[in-house]
């Protein structure tokens, strides 16, 4: 029995060593810090164990007083994206951050982008509004997204998404009932999600804890 215990200890140590070597390698070939690596893996689990509820809002058939298709935004490569290009498509808008426990959702958003080509558009809006978890400049953010998650969907210039004088016009539309027709809910944290349907109507809001690949999001996209 003693020999078996020692064997298990040795196996555990070897496994831990191998995992440590892999972690060092992964961090060397990416732009992630050790803090970012563990935060992305631990934070969602802690939130789930704590029983933190995730807000979900849904409202269909409400015509927005201000057309969604009049909006535009500047991408982080300085090109202007006119939202009139999204007619006939669903659009998922997400405020993002590189140093958040939910940053791993970039990978899920990229999967959505690839799963529904031509039917669903994913848009990322980096923001430093929540605990300053997006301190990098636009070039740094673009490199981080591409290198760590292979992001190919549009990422816009960093801006504020919460209500105030500096709120991005797109997020002013998303959070002002006078513009979108019904919703006043602002992002509760990084990776809050808003869904606009093929007719340019805001139909859903999902809190950060709701996975982009979660059943309710997929159902909303497939409706």
Where are these predicted regions, by residue range?
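Amphipathic alpha-helical repeat scaffolds
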Residues: 95-99
